[in-house]
């Protein structure tokens, strides 16, 4: 059985110039088609020196299911590589933030976001097909103020899947124990969503 991320691994950690024009143009068309002028969901993606991760990340976001209009905004956070060239080539909506750090970058994106629901994520990640929809399903509940998500590692060639599974299991156990008394500490500021109203 093919994993959901298999096609994105073909371009992950590869320079965009080594990827076929057909793939690049396909992602560009999808990305531009899903950008709404009146989004309900704003996905804010921060990037610092992510030229070899952006294509896979944005491609996976373009393939996400979302039942409402959305926008994807990328914030270039003081990159010194070809991050901005990749964003331009993909036709991404992006902004520059000169103050270095995820807090500054996220705030820049949020300042430009128009959606009622904001999802803050990172550019070095590939997102499963229902990622945005899963956040949204929870955020629309009146009693929910914010959401967060865990992450999993994709093993490199020659790496053991089990080593990563042990690490992730210990991490998840720690978070479950922590969530008993202080669930707000489980967010960790990496990937999270919230409603603006």
Regions flagged by a language model, labelled:
Residues 59-69:
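Short, acidic, metal-binding catalytic loop of nucleotide-sugar glycosyltransferases
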Residues 149-155, 164-185, 189:
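Short, flexible, basic/aromatic active-site loop/helix in glycosyltransferases
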Residues 52-55, 81-88, 130:
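Acidic helix N-cap motif at the loop->helix transition within catalytic regions
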Residues 60, 76-84:
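A conserved acidic beta->alpha catalytic loop
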Residues 130-161:
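Conserved donor NDP-sugar-binding/catalytic core segment of glycosyltransferases
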Residues 118:
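Short aromatic/hydrophobic "clamp" motif used to bind/position activated sugar donors
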Residues 1-60:
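N-proximal low-complexity "stem/linker" segments adjacent to membrane-targeting elements
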Residues 97-113:
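Glycine-rich, basic loop-to-helix element that forms the pyrophosphate-binding segment
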